Amino acid sequence: MHCLIAAMLVVGLGQASGFQEIACPEIYGGHLQGIATDNEQNIYWSFTVALVKTNRAGELLKTVPAPTHQGDLTWVDGKVYVAVNLGKFNQEPGQADSWVYVYDARDLTLLEKRAVPELVHGAGGMAFHDGKFIVVGGLPEGYTENYAYEYDRNLDFVQRHVINSGYTKMGIQTACWFDGAWWFGCYENEKGLLKTDEQFNLLGRFTPNYSVGIAPWTDGNCLRGVTVPLENKQHRGAAVVDLPGKASETAAK
């Protein structure tokens, strides 16, 4: 959710060797924040200050500017939902300004803005499953757990869930429901992908970290977002066809 050193950002592409890769066309301000897919395998790419739609081959369909700082996103029933923080990340309560922006998936027209003040450390990512949205975000140093905030289909707050993951750098960046579990991408270089059950009990930690995008794909696979920094704070993005959870560390007892 914040600027990262180049080595952390390009690590995904280094691990992509041998995997099918879908490139997002053009370059954008800020790094890739998240990816989402719809029922037709169109791909929605969230960069820090841009929202992009491509087809499954990576051909550009639409791009629109976005507020800084836009985060991870999800597609639900013809709409794209994006976690947005207009304030500060990773601070104690009172400094974030957390929102969910809702776009028409057809042409990326902005339809609605919904405040989510419960994300007190900054809204940075979101996913949808079983009639509910889960929004995740930043985390100040010194905390020993992460949080997942549950909202109903109307984006009304339901409850906060605790993930006993220990501290992860800047909290959780991306979220996805896949293969009967929640997956959460963090900026940790090692074991930065968290897997939980439906009740958010930690099941394991995995490498690579999926911190700039995770979304369901075809044939039982996922897309893993990767990003490459260029000059003048510009970035390219891509998605690698991959499968999360191949290398793990035993979950805490």
Model-inferred region functions:
Residues 37-40, 75-78, 128-130, 177-180, ...:
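Residue-level detector of Asp-centered blade-edge/turn motifs that repeat once per structural unit
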Residues 42-44, 80-82, 133-136, 182-185, ...:
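Conserved beta-propeller blade signature
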Residues 22-49, 69-72:
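Beta-strand-rich domains and repeat architectures in extracellular enzymes and scaffolds
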Residues 45-46, 89-98, 139-146, 187-189, ...:
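Short, solvent-exposed loop/turn segments at conserved positions within beta-propeller repeat blades
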Residues 30-31, 68-69, 96, 120-122, ...:
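Beta-rich catalytic cores
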Residues 55-59, 104-108, 152-156, 196-201:
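Short loop/turn segments that connect beta-strands within beta-propeller blades
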Residues 23-29, 63-66, 114-120, 161-168, ...:
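Surface loop/turn motifs at the tips and blade-to-blade linkers of beta-strand repeat domains
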Residues 59-98:
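Blade-loop segments of beta-propeller domains
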